[in-house]
Amino acid sequence: MKGYDSGAVGWIYSAYEIAAIPGTIICGIVSDYVFKGRRAITTMIYMVLVALFVFIYWQTEHNLVMDSICLIAIGFLIYGPVMLIGVHALDLAPKKAAGTAAGLTGFFGYFFGTALLANIMLGYVVDHLGWDWSFIILLGACALAFIFTAFTVREEQYLVKESTNKH
């Protein structure tokens, strides 16, 4: 990682993963209590912040403290939307299709996110085009996540309003 020794990289990566725990919990709390069940708004805010920290990390020249802050922030912020997308799909899908909605979001998230794009495609891009292009792709993925989530805002507002009127 940017020429740092393996010991420093190990600690930073551990901090990145550990930051995901409070990040995911806080994302759920923000979604439920601050935005009253509005998963899309929470996801969009988190994705903007992920993009910001990815950009800062990309542009920072060999600064262990800043790189660590960025990676911990990314770890804190990225897993919340990963969790919320499944919850969001359950909120938007008809009750009798809830299992299918959860299964499809899990499958496509794993297949295209972890198994295919994150591991194979980004490795290929780094090897053949360099790190700059990998960061451009990551920022593009953040933008796409924001845009696709934005398509659900109106339907989500309707469902939240309808749910509030029933109670």
Predicted feature residues:
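Short amphipathic helix-loop junctions that connect adjacent transmembrane helices
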Residues: 1-7
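A late C-terminal transmembrane helix in Major Facilitator Superfamily
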Residues: 24, 95-128
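Helix-to-loop junctions at the C-terminal end of transmembrane segments
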Residues: 25-36, 126
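Cytoplasmic membrane-interface "Motif A"-like loop-to-helix N-cap segments
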Residues: 33-47
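A membrane-interface helix-boundary motif in multi-pass transporters
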Residues: 38-41, 121-141
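C-terminal ends and interior cores of transmembrane alpha-helices
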Residues: 48-62
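Multi-pass alpha-helical transporter architecture, strongest
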Residues: 57-59, 131, 136-167
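Intracellular juxtamembrane helix-capping segments at the cytosolic ends
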Residues: 79-94
